[in-house]
């Protein structure tokens, strides 16, 4: 029988450039019950370890779905049409949000991101990223000229995402993210 040798998609010398922390962010879920906490641990593990080559895009939804019990998810609170409902995979938006904040700090290209229909408690207003099928999905693209590595995990009641790669940005740069409330809408 003939043996076919296939070239590796990622070469060792490319991976050797992944040596610097480009951006990191953590959120707290100490008020979450066991089911929601389990969803955060499961979803973070599904994103953890992704390597993105230059120009490649990561979809939070594609990494984490399907949101089923068979895929390790539990029923927990989620937002749906302006209400709080129980849903399999409830809480995974905190994963998207934490990854979004790490991606902003790494200055990755944000291809797709939508906010929630209501305020969330784990980040300031406008700093969130919702997940609802492919309609509300976080997609980030590696706009660096070298590969990046995405690390995601929970420890205790903290969820963390860190993006690693080759740092090329000036060391003395300053990047600031501001959440400012410009008006309130009172619902009746």
Q: Which residues does each PLM region occupy?
A:
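Well-ordered beta-sheet/strand-loop patches within structured domains
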Residues: 1-188
